[in-house]
């Protein structure tokens, strides 16, 4: 992995970012927003409302993007995260966080809220990445992110050709079987795979796993019967470790339609998880 840390996952980019104001007159102010393009969004904020920036940031720049949380399965999931981060007092998931403390800066308060959000349902089980766009402004969170949420540094790179993985690179992996084969069978239930999004396939070289989303989810959740969304598990074919988020993104990479950045995607099943 390069100095920028974890690469952006393949597929559409949905991020929720934290801006920090460098204007001496407004220094210390922050802004939370949603974006599909971090570089362009910062330019819009610094360009004012006429350039597409928010009214709260217009005329108060320059603004710097300090960090961005990305890896959301859909724009709706990211927008719900954005709303809760902006209004922690109104989210029942964050009732335990408490209001801003006396002497606590807006920046520190938003980092405290973020730390709790990454460990609160439903976000605690999403395959998110915490990226410090400005590594020099990095601070340790009051609660460390969950083990499956990696830290990354620097601006998000262009769409990555391969997903994040725990063990060695798969650059020399053999071509995967055609996921669109209408006669493909699930490796777990042996039934024909007819899912519109195609089967989940193991990315490890030589592994021929193909499985229904539900079948593999049930396999991964055997040790967590009370949960609905897996975090990770062992491939039932090659017995190597897999992150659930990587499997989903690999599947989406082959099925996702190209749309304009300004368009919002249809609701994902994780959007039904209440905030």
From Swiss-Prot:
Q: For bias kind Pro residues, which ranges apply?
A: 148-161
For this chain's UniProt record, which GO biological process terms are given? DNA double-strand break processing involved in repair via single-strand annealing; DNA repair; double-strand break repair via homologous recombination; negative regulation of telomere maintenance via telomere lengthening; positive regulation of t-circle formation; t-circle formation; telomere maintenance via telomere lengthening; telomeric D-loop disassembly
Q: Which family does it belong to?
A: Belongs to the SLX1 family.
Q: What UniProt keywords are attached to this protein's entry?
A: DNA damage, DNA recombination, DNA repair, Endonuclease, Hydrolase, Metal-binding, Nuclease, Nucleus, Zinc, Zinc-finger
Instruction: Give the SLX1-type zinc finger regions.
Output: 186-238
As for what it does, the entry says: Catalytic subunit of the SLX1-SLX4 structure-specific endonuclease that resolves DNA secondary structures generated during DNA repair and recombination. Has endonuclease activity towards branched DNA substrates, introducing single-strand cuts in duplex DNA close to junctions with ss-DNA. Has a preference for 5'-flap structures, and promotes symmetrical cleavage of static and migrating Holliday junctions (HJs). Resolves HJs by generating two pairs of ligatable, nicked duplex products.
- What are the required cofactors? a divalent metal cation
User: What organism, scientifically named, is this protein from?
Assistant: Homo sapiens
InterPro entries, per database record: GIY-YIG_endonuc, GIY-YIG_endonuc_sf, Slx1, SLX1_C, SLX1_endonuclease, Znf_RING/FYVE/PHD
Give the record's GO CC terms. Answer: nucleoplasm; Slx1-Slx4 complex
How would you summarize the oligomeric state and partners of this protein? Forms a heterodimer with SLX4.
Q: Does the keyword Transmembrane apply?
A: no
* Database matches in Pfam families: GIY-YIG, SLX1_C
What the entry lists under HAMAP family is as follows:
Endonuc_su_Slx1 (MF_03100)
Q: Where in this protein does the record put region Disordered? A: 148-179
Places the protein is found: Nucleus
Which parts of the sequence belong to the GIY-YIG domain? 12-95
- This entry's Enzyme Commission designation comes to 3.1.-.-
Q: Which gene encodes it?
A: SLX1A
Check the record and name the CDD domains matching this protein. GIY-YIG_SLX1
Task: Indicate whether tRNA-binding appears among the record's keywords.
Answer: no
Q: What is this protein called?
A: Structure-specific endonuclease subunit SLX1
Molecular functions (GO terms): 5'-flap endonuclease activity; crossover junction DNA endonuclease activity; zinc ion binding
What's the source species' lineage? Eukaryota, Metazoa, Chordata, Craniata, Vertebrata
* Major site of localization recorded for this protein: nucleus
